[in-house]
Amino acid sequence: MKTLLLTLVVVTIVCLDLGYTIVCHTTATSPISAVTCPPGENLCYRKMWCDAFCSSRGKVVELGCAATCPSKKPYEEVTCCSTDKCNPHPKQRPG
């Protein structure tokens, strides 16, 4: 009986650890919202760059979830992080 109980406890701990998901801000929806990332995507990212309207509108911002930090192009700023809601829009208060 003790062996069965110990086995159940170990299995529960392993399953809880494997089931961790991160919450990231995303620009895939309008307005910007926080979403639970799919399994395997355990990073939040923020990409920023200037387009033709940068001087009047500011930088374009892309937020989302990723399995690995997106590659940075020469004209982009890319940051990645691994805690819930760690990638807020620059004009948005963290939270």
UniProtKB/Swiss-Prot annotation:
The keyword DNA damage does not apply. SUPFAM superfamilies: Snake toxin-like. It comes from the Eukaryota. This is Alpha-bungarotoxin. Keywords: Acetylcholine receptor inhibiting toxin, Disulfide bond, Ion channel impairing toxin, Neurotoxin, Postsynaptic neurotoxin, Secreted, Signal, Toxin. Gene3D superfamilies: CD59. The keyword Zinc-finger does not apply. Expressed by the venom gland. PROSITE patterns: SNAKE_TOXIN (PS00272). Pfam families: Toxin_cobra-type. GO terms for cellular component: extracellular region. It is found in: Secreted. Binds with high affinity to muscular (tested on Torpedo marmorata, Kd=0.4 nM) and neuronal (tested on chimeric alpha-7/CHRNA7, Kd=0.95 nM) nicotinic acetylcholine receptor (nAChR) and inhibits acetylcholine from binding to the receptor, thereby impairing neuromuscular and neuronal transmission. It also shows an activity on GABA(A) receptors. It antagonises GABA-activated currents with high potency when tested on primary hippocampal neurons. Is identical to Alpha-bungarotoxin (A31) from B.candidus (AC Q7T3J2). GO terms for molecular function: acetylcholine receptor inhibitor activity; ion channel regulator activity; toxin activity.
